[in-house]
């Protein structure tokens, strides 16, 4: 997305690398890059972007049939359809758009996961990545109209 199409104070579509797309309403729903996108519309939002760690192990027989979340540690564990344990969490304390994690955070998430599900210690780790997530100061999402008519936000 290159920018917003505007007529007066109204957003009428978006400009992309493949051309213009006109719309009566445009929604900004860009996990991890909402503040960047909002700036293209001239808006400043109280959102910071942080890296959230994620890992997946080799597949095993069913062990977890739902998402287990630990709010105090900002971590979660679930199991994929292919049997891999997916776990992650622990926001990096610095604003970043990097799709990788820093070693102390990676260690912290792995330590919490091992304490929660000790069986992880016997599994091969297949992948690790950092995903960018948007955070407000109180952790609540911003879902609203913007001052520009026709432009909405879910960030």
Identify the residue ranges that each predicted region occupies:
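Nucleotide phosphate-binding site architecture
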Residues: 2, 35, 152
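Active-site lid/adjacent beta-loop-alpha segment flanking the redox-cofactor pocket in flavoenzymes
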Residues: 44, 59-150
